[in-house]
Amino acid sequence: MTELTISSADISGAIEQYVATFSADPTREEIGIVSDAGDGIAHVEGLPSVMTQELLEFPGGVLGVALNLDERSVGTVVLGDFQDIEEGQQVKRTGEVLSVPVGDAFLGRVINPLGQPIDGRGDIEAETRRALELQAPSVVQRQSVSEPLQTGIKAIDSQTPIGRGQRQLIIGDRKTGKTAVCIDTILNQKQAWETGDPAQQVRCIYVAVGQKGSTVAAVRRTLDEAGALEYTTIVAAPASDAAGFKWLAPYTGSALGQHWMYQGKHVLIVFDDLTKQAEAYRAISLLLRRPPGREAYPGDVFYLHSRLLERCAKLSDELGAGSLTGLPIIETKANDISAYIPTNVISITDGQCFLQTDLFNQGVRPAVNVGVSVSRVGGAAQIKAMKEVAGSLRLELSQYRELEAFAAFASDLDATSKAQLERGARLVELLKQPQNSPYPVEEQVVAIYLGTGGHLDSVPVEDVMRFEQEFLDHVRGSHADILADIRETKKFSEDTETKLTNAVNAFKKSFAATDGSSVEVKGVAAEALDESAVGQETVQVRKPAPKK
């Protein structure tokens, strides 16, 4: 049996070598302890150096955002599954503020508010990351709105036009077509996208907050079937998600849009809807024991929306002249636009389209109430052709609404009032439009000219939509030069008007109303004078009879 020999020289040499190479570089890591957790909120004790909006890591890789920084604890919103978070668990700092990945690879995808794909189509290779809380462009970094963003909806493009960089509020009760208006606007950008010209292309972002999962799936399917998903990103925080996700989703969409805007590109973002975001933020604030204000909303709920919507802008030429156009949606109750959140967002935005339940139930769709709807800056972006043909449209519709209410009580109306009622009824019918069928702007100009130019006065009200569709088909086939001229020059010249009038008159000869009658307007010939009477006309001036 061999004996074990221990060499003291070898041992001392090994120790000396270890000491020589030893590096006393201790790592310092702040560890917090969960003091209580529940309903998507966790209070963490410790972490004295934590920053506001910093990401914290819970066991299992679940992330949270530090919102409340108290003396002894940190109020954290948990992003993800909070069921497994328990009292006594350790929490680590990440040293990073909340950010999301951005880039062109997100087009055509459905993501959650953390930028992670949820459509089952694999990972997304991001170009870079962008912090959610970034300052909006300053005054000198902006320019005034001057380029139109066509929605494809006649009632909006003619009376409340939207420009690139504008914030136009879509407001109304539930089930009045608010989402449909925004989806039609996204679909209408397809023609510009297919040109391949970056100056015309508009990238779209649809942010779904608190919607049903089936509703988000239906929107995605609609966009996919229309070929619009290739230039659209959907940020989804459905009703089943935690309040933290619903609060963050609009900021995620905005960060993605700002990334493209600062590259000189044009972006359209839809927030559907900000009422549910405010409710989620209210829930978070109450759980964090922040003092409630009006309608139990926290004091900074105005700032919640203002700092989000102020990011929509038309950048100056020095910064690339990109734009971010916002369409926030607000849901009202019983058409009450004087409630807290509606008045807040109305004061922040550049105009609003008010959708009314009564109009919707009457079959006027889109149910835009012209009297309350307004666009404060979009008029500067409206093309001249539309301004010319639609200039009198708002006034005529307003007069029609007043007369309509008066006519319900008056049995006898003068000829002028009757003519206004007849014209107004045809204009209302003309502005009706099926869902998911946006109109190119040149066809909108032609259609609205039919109404404001008096060419529909001889067409029965029930035949107006059919007349419009068949006439547009006729113009596309036989008078494509008229549409091309309006599209290219963006003007409605006298020559174009003459051509269009002749085309309408010729088309009326072949169009038959539902009852089989003709809609052609035939002039009434005056009775001819005898030869002896020609040149014998006299003017007689008579004094009034003296008063007795």
Curated annotation (Swiss-Prot):
Domain of life: Bacteria
Residues carrying the site annotation Required for activity: 373
A single Gene Ontology CC term: plasma membrane
Family annotation (InterPro entries): ATP_synth_asu-like_sf (IPR023366), ATP_synth_asu_C (IPR000793), ATP_synth_asu_C_sf (IPR038376), ATP_synth_F1_a_nt-bd_dom (IPR033732), ATP_synth_F1_asu (IPR005294), ATPase_a/bsu_AS (IPR020003), ATPase_F1/V1/A1_a/bsu_N (IPR004100), ATPase_F1/V1/A1_a/bsu_N_sf (IPR036121)
Subcellular location: Cell membrane
GO molecular function terms listed in the Swiss-Prot or TrEMBL record: ADP binding; ATP binding; proton-transporting ATP synthase activity, rotational mechanism
Binding site for ATP: 172-179
EC number from the UniProt entry: 7.1.2.2
Catalytic reactions on record: ATP + H2O + 4 H(+)(in) = ADP + phosphate + 5 H(+)(out)
Any Pfam family the entry gives: ATP-synt_ab_N
Keyword entries, A-Z: ATP synthesis, ATP-binding, Cell membrane, CF(1), Hydrogen ion transport, Ion transport, Membrane, Nucleotide-binding, Translocase, Transport
Membrane topology annotation: Peripheral membrane protein
Top EC class for this record: translocase
Protein family membership: Belongs to the ATPase alpha/beta chains family.
Function comment: Produces ATP from ADP in the presence of a proton gradient across the membrane. The alpha chain is a regulatory subunit.
UniProt cross-references to NCBIfam families, sorted A to Z: atpA (TIGR00962), PRK13343.1 (NF009884)
HAMAP family from the UniProt entry: ATP_synth_alpha_bact (MF_01346)
Name of the protein described by the UniProt record: ATP synthase subunit alpha
Organism per entry: Mycobacteroides abscessus (strain ATCC 19977 / DSM 44196 / CCUG 20993 / CIP 104536 / JCM 13569 / NCTC 13031 / TMC 1543 / L948)
Gene: atpA
